[in-house]
From Swiss-Prot:
The keyword Hydrolase does not apply. GO terms for cellular component: cytoplasm. Signal peptide: none annotated. Belongs to the RNA methyltransferase RlmH family. The lineage of its organism: Bacteria, Pseudomonadati, Pseudomonadota, Gammaproteobacteria, Methylococcales. Pfam families: SPOUT_MTase. CDD domains: RlmH-like. Specifically methylates the pseudouridine at position 1915 (m3Psi1915) in 23S rRNA. This is Ribosomal RNA large subunit methyltransferase H. It is found in: Cytoplasm.
Amino acid sequence: MQLNLVCVGERMPSWVNEGYEEYARRLPRECALMLREIAPGKRTRNCDIQRILADEGQRMLAAVGGNAHIVTLDVGGKDWSTRELAEVLARWLREGRDIALLVGGPDGLSDACRQRAAESWSLSRMTFPHPLVRVIVAEQLYRAWTLLNNHPYHR
């Protein structure tokens, strides 16, 4: 199984890349976390946001392939505790399918992404900067993995 974090946005600050990599590299091969960046649509003062969202969504879905188990990161999703996320990760590992975690851009996710999703995960009721979401997701997935493997990281 491979975890694919599919995010709208490129050229992140170094602290984002370093934070993400710190946790992604700790995960073992059977639970590898890979980042797939999608270029954001060009936003201007009079742009058609729905068209941009649809285009970003189409490119996100194309990046994950047809057989992936899609999970959107969305404020309206389930707010799993760390232990609940560990149980979800254990289920994903048992099922063996690749997982695609979709993080939208500044205007969120397209309807097509939401419709294709098998699950939706909310990190918080608060809104986080999209670059920070990458780091939080990587850390939480690593923490969930350590719980499943009785590693002392999660205490």
